[in-house]
């Protein structure tokens, strides 16, 4: 689905979920959805990820991975606006092990404090490979939302 399609039908779906008793909904995209910021109980991974990163590293040098090269400039700007020195690289979420190793090596050349996998589709396996290759902590976008959701429902 395109973001446009999601936005056009999403408000109705969110209301349906609320009416059916759902307390917490995770938006499965690390993009921004300003149209829905007022929905109570909707977790936006872009927000949870940003907050988690800020809590772990108030300032410093980070590498942000985005799926497509054309997304890197916007991603870099977003994280720079949060006060970070940013290296922005692309890596497809379905990258092979070899591609993930190369990405980790590329990131590792930048004397980083933290790496962010800024797409819901990145996996724990990719996170592990990049962490081992680059030698710095890695935060997975989906993990930030799931950990927050658990706090809200437990």
Protein language model features and the residues they cover:
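Non-catalytic structural scaffold of enzyme domains
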Residues: 1-154
């Amino acid at each position: 689905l395109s973001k446009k399609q999601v936005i056009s039908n999403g408000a109705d779906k969110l209301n349906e979920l609320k009416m059916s008793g759902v307390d917490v909904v995770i938006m499965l995209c690390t993009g921004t959805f300003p149209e829905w910021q007022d929905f109570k109980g909707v977790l936006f991974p872009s927000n949870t990820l940003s907050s988690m990163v800020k809590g772990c590293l108030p300032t410093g040098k980070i590498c942000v991975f985005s799926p497509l090269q054309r997304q890197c400039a916007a991603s870099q700007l977003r994280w720079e606006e949060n006060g970070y020195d940013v290296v922005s690289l692309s890596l497809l979420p379905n990258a092979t092990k070899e591609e993930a190793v190369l990405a980790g090596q590329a990131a590792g050349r930048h004397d980083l404090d933290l790496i962010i996998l800024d797409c819901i589709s990145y996996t724990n396996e990719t996170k592990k490979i990049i962490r081992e290759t680059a030698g710095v902590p890695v935060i997975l976008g989906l993990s930030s939302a799931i950990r927050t959701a658990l706090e809200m429902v437990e």
